[in-house]
Amino acid sequence: MGRARRPGGRLRRVGLGTAISLGVGGIGIGLLIAGGGAVAVHRANTTEFCTGCHVYDRFAQTFEHSQHRANLTGVQVGCADCHVPDDSLAALLWTKARSGVRAAWAYYVEGLDTPEEFARARPELQADAHTWFVATDSQTCRRCHEVAAMDLQAQRAGARASHQAAATGRRTCVDCHSDVPHGQAPARAE
């Protein structure tokens, strides 16, 4: 016959003090990892981080003189404010990973490191961004620009109609504002 089991046998063999120490240590390590991850995500969402890559430095040049960077109010947005969703950590991490892989591919494989290569690729890059903004209903735009808070009566008729359509989901920001903030790219070569 086998040995009779005593309640709490394993815990008693390990020792209550050891179990508590392991639990507290595990929580501490988890907090350090989570804190380090939060710092890494925060730093990776800065404009300086984004534009540190040669692929994106030319987009940074087009952005520097836009209304989202240089304006009368002093409000400035960065790359992540427009290009990184904040609805979930998973969406944020997926977008950052996807962007990083695509940038590395463009730079190292496609050779997108000269002004000429950038000019050639810009229409496709902006078309990809436009597709993403349409697919997400321009949610990153809507974090700052709330149609419900706009004075529609003070707007011209065309803008008023477009913003009313955006409020009901029939239009999205980039349907009209596709040149914000990087300027209009030339038409994509087919």
Annotate each predicted stretch with a short phrase:
Residues G2-E190:
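Short sequence/structural segments immediately N-terminal
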